[in-house]
């Protein structure tokens, strides 16, 4: 609510906001005390100085994300917002991704430089996707489950900074918010919502990558899975997706043909 009021210069009281939001009356006083607090005002001022943000009511809010279930009310970002208007491929996969993922991405991501690659900046497949995108001159979009000034995992700090400089870094969490377990499924819905197509590289049979793939399917996105060895645990999730109807990603041309529709 604070970001919406600040962004649009609305002259709304805390009580009016609580009523608009249909907040139960027993919580009104607590909400008003928090909303009018000096701490919240200082936090908003700090964000105004150090990051940019976009609310769900603004014209630049990504239309693809707006059409999904439960879009974030506010997106904090660093970088170039215009990359959201380019054809976008999401890449997700195992944190323990093998050399197979890296080799496949080197082959598959030789895409037009108008293409953006979106992932979650986690260890493994996410980091590999961003690294290959940067090597090939594609614009990266990183969606993280922390504040923009936090790094998780810590070893991805330089990569996260490169993504913000060369593309776009996004979070629905304010500054100084550290990683929590439930942040990552929430982050995955943003990845699924922003992309045109989603690629799963390697994934176990019970994997967060499969949750992201299902979210992408619910948002009417095209889902591709990299076929793998039948006796390898990191291929079980992808092979299961293919069995359920995902397109096997056998060559680069499949992605090129798909992206042609979004130019």
Regions found by a protein language model. Name each.
Residues 1-59:
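Short, small/acidic-rich helices and loops at N termini and domain boundaries
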Residues 56-263:
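Glycine-biased, small-residue-rich flexible motifs in mid-sequence functional cores and linkers
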């Amino acid at each position: 609510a604070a970001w919406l009021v600040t962004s649009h210069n609305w002259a709304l009281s805390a009580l009016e906001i609580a009523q608009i939001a249909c907040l139960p009356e027993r919580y009104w006083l607590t909400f008003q005390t928090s909303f009018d607090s000096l701490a919240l005002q200082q936090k908003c001022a700090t964000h105004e100085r150090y990051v940019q943000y976009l609310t769900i009511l603004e014209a630049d809010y990504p239309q693809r994300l707006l059409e999904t279930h439960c879009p974030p009310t506010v997106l904090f970002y660093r970088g170039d917002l215009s990359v959201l208007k380019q054809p976008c491929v999401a890449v997700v996969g195992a944190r323990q991704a093998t050399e197979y993922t890296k080799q496949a991405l080197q082959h598959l991501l030789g895409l037009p430089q108008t293409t953006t690659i979106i992932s979650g900046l986690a260890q493994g497949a996410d980091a590999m996707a961003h690294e290959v995108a940067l090597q090939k001159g594609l614009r990266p979009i990183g969606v993280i489950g922390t504040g923009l000034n936090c790094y998780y995992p810590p070893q991805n700090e330089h990569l996260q900074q490169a993504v913000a400089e060369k593309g776009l870094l996004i979070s629905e969490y304010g500054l100084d918010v550290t990683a929590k377990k439930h942040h990552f499924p929430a982050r995955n819905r943003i990845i699924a919502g922003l992309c045109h197509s989603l690629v799963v590289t390697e994934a176990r049979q019970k994997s967060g990558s499969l949750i992201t793939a299902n979210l992408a399917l619910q948002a009417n996105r095209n889902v591709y899975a990299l076929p793998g060895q039948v006796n390898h645990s990191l291929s079980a999730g992808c092979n299961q997706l293919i069995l359920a109807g995902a397109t096997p990603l056998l060559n680069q041309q499949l992605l090129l043909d798909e992206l042609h529709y979004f130019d």
